[in-house]
């Protein structure tokens, strides 16, 4: 297959990353996509004009990320002579506010100008507003500061024609798991077959009798989706998925340091954690995903689950999004009158019982 043919099969989604200069856009991009750690982003310089990144995510889903410099001269250019070029065919706008900004009113004017241009050329796009650097706000003031900023932003969005469900707000900081949480929501919105994936994971979780399954993208360690069963739904650690993302990133950095390779190139076959109350393993599911499995504290069930996940790999191969394959799966599901992926996982179940 030629490069041109391959590119046509890739599903490209244009994502704008915008905000005033110094808001933290490039820092978060470097942490999520370039495997930086928080303490290292201080040496990053300001973004000049637009930095384009084509990021392959889960196979043929290509994120066309535009990191737009926030200096006034660049913003003026985006809104005037580059207006149609920048704001056309946008799937997602991620706008970053610095909660500690001394020019909050000016920031809001810039935001209003931005979404006005977005509504002109991409009125159906989704807006994720990241209220960033929340670590700089005293603990007792965080909720109030977030509520006030969200109210101001939502009012502006409604004035410019964006309905409530088109806009999401997330408080973020590079120093905790909140950054992974916010970007996970962005990725979940962009993945076109998330419901298909969840249906298949639910069947697999039932087969394994797993407490929880979490699907991670291998390069970024972002959560794609998860399935939680039974009492695990009452787990008080609501940020546990993002904590695992952070642990995986740290583990990759440690491996890179000891092997002399780049963190983005590091991979591992499997990681296991065993306690008296539960057992956990994370392993490759497809070329571009890892699956974390939380099991009861039973060695036999744990080992059976590891085998069954290996058997499941072939059935989950179409998660590495190929449009033609995805459409065929959906067409077959419509013909059968069942949810996409159900018959696939039933096959896994039969194999597991035979084993």
Kindly give the residue locations of the regions a language model identified.
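Short, flexible boundary segments at extreme N-termini or domain junctions of P-loop NTPases and their
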Residues: 1-20, 53, 153-160, 168, ...
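Glycine-rich phosphate-binding P-loop
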Residues: 14-34
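Switch I (effector-binding) loop of TRAFAC-class P-loop GTPase G-domains
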Residues: 33-61
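Switch II of P-loop NTPase G domains
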Residues: 49-50, 60-117
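Conserved beta-strand/loop subsegment of P-loop NTPase cores
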Residues: 91-96, 122-135, 159-172
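Canonical P-loop GTPase G-domain recognition
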Residues: 136-204, 210-212, 232-234, 355
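A charged amphipathic helix-loop-strand protein-protein interaction module that recurs
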Residues: 197-198, 228-282
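Short hydrophobic alpha-helical segments used for membrane anchoring or interfacial signaling
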Residues: 213-219
